[in-house]
Amino acid sequence: MSRSPLHPIPLLSEGYQDTPAPLPPLLPPLQNPSSRSWASRVFGPSTWGLSCLLALQHFLVLASLLWASHLLLLHGLPPGGLSYPPAQLLASSFFSCGLSTVLQTWMGSRLPLIQAPSLEFLIPALVLTNQKLPLTTKTPGNASLSLPLCSLTRSCHGLELWNTSLREVSGAVVVSGLLQGTIGLLGVPGRVFPYCGPLVLAPSLVVAGLSAHKEVAQFCSAHWGLALLLILLMVVCSQHLGSCQIPLCSWRPSSTSTHICIPVFRLLSVLAPVACVWFISAFVGTSVIPLQLSEPSDAPWFWLPHPGEWEWPLLTPRALAAGISMALAASTSSLGCYALCGQLLRLSPPPPHACSRGLSLEGLGSVLAGLLGSPLGTASSFPNVGTVSLFQTGSRRVAHLVGLFCMGLGLSPRLAQLFTSIPLPVLGGVLGVTQAVVLSAGFSSFHLADIDSGRNVFIVGFSIFMALLLPRWLREAPVLLNTGWSPLDMFLRSLLAEPIFLAGLLGFLLENTISGTRAERGLGQRLPTSFTAQEIQMLQQSRRKAAQEYGLPLPIKNLCSCIPQPLHCLCPMPEDSGDEGGSSKTGERADLLPNSGESYSTASREGVRSQ
């Protein structure tokens, strides 16, 4: 009985639930054959087992990010500082993140993006709580040692303020969700995108990768040996052994079966290292988690999250100011995350209607999180996008499964409490590797522009340096900003401490105020003024594919005709289908860019910008 030879089969997404397969390049001659693409690939049929395996690893990254955010926000919480178990607060965040993820992948941006709390929500929350709750002080002899002032008694005056402070943070999250949803409903991304080139996106991604280095170092410092072991295992599995193909067992008859080889090490580059280091950490007992957050509590086994479970969010002028800064920073971060995910999956750039829907549903998720009492909103997760790059595959089915996992775990606070035992070195190692991928993706975007230009060198350097300098200055300034009005102080301190927003804002202003040619800015050097018939066909095919991948699902698409005119920015336009334009004869060249290259369409500009 002869057996078919072993050979790897590229994993292409099939069916409605899977992520789009990689699109062909806009112009074949411009493709660099020597470059290694970060294409979305699936090895063999996308089985449910493989999807569950990938979803479990994305869930581990999400759980690490979620638990790290709660640790940073509640690290000064005295025993008894909350009127409910901290595990219940974590379960509420799991539920809101899961529901937001399902909505985002179903009718939002349609990209396989996981929704999670981001640094853009954490920074204003820390500013809001620290300004109102000075529960920690620094000892004269050791500037790095923080002592809780109210850890020995539950009758301290500051303890009853914790619930009020967290209610105020939840109110800020609700405000941010409402504002972010409004930004999406008004179609702001479609109006801003034509003015955003590689010199706006690249600094934002670089700063996004660097912005969490302090928190990552804090988690890794709990045990540098375990953290370095985790990082080493993740790098070896995803990079050094990433191309090792292992045959997948098949239950079909050998005469008709095709033996599929899959890169097991790359597909397990998160689960295997995390499980190994978690086991070692439990064996040696190095998990250093605050007792008030990890001790066994009376959290229920089953709990149905609903608004007003503890108390309703508190809306104050300071919460309003913090919520505005959250919305501006989270919107900037999410738009960069959309572009990064499309770049890693080798897709066409997300169209304005997909970005508008994505921001609208992220705002809805943040409103839901705030109403459920969560102190952190939901936004597209950069660490999970970095995980997509490690796996080199992305799937909407995987994102749906992650959302369902989170919603199921959010119904059981007792099960959610299990993830409070994640060791700190694991948190630091996972976030460190995934953030490094985001950083490298930002650097890879510089090649689209003329990086040797003095104009571009100044824009890149100034945007990145000032985005990292201003938050550091605010954090260590001897005198805080004091305008005499507390809400304005809160707004300035929160917004100026958001590095991703600062990088995007500075890059946007400098890019559009300093004169430069389109080729110098990276907006037109790859787009010729005329195309052959074959190139026209490929361009139309690419547009049709983009319309298929970013378009609304059929039940929702049929309702577009009933949507009021001001909300038509959420629906695909007729020209997005790619059917416009006549056919050309073989060898004929058609001018798609009349009036020279200075006036080509927004879609073409975005296509060039994301290549």
Curated annotation (Swiss-Prot):
Residues 1-52, 110-168, 213-215, 291-319, 380-397, 450-455, 511-611 are cytoplasmic. GO terms for molecular function: transmembrane transporter activity. It is a multi-pass membrane protein. Pfam families: Xan_ur_permease (PF00860). Keywords: Cytoplasm, Membrane, Transmembrane, Transmembrane helix. It is found in: Membrane. Residues 596-605 have a biased composition (Polar residues). Residues 74-88, 190-191, 237-269, 341-358, 418-426, 476-489 are extracellular. GO terms for cellular component: cytoplasm; membrane. It catalyses: hypoxanthine(out) + Na(+)(out) = hypoxanthine(in) + Na(+)(in). Its main location: membrane. One of its GO terms (biological process) is hypoxanthine transport. InterPro entries: NCS2 (IPR006043). It comes from the Eukaryota. Residues 574-611 are annotated as: Disordered. The chain crosses the membrane at residues 53-73, 89-109, 169-189, 192-212, 216-236, 270-290, 320-340, 359-379, 398-417, 427-449, 456-475, 490-510. Acts as a sodium-dependent hypoxanthine transporter. May show xanthine-hypoxanthine exchange activity. Belongs to the nucleobase:cation symporter-2 (NCS2) (TC 2.A.40) family. This is Solute carrier family 23 member 3. It comes from Mus musculus (Mouse). The gene is Slc23a3.
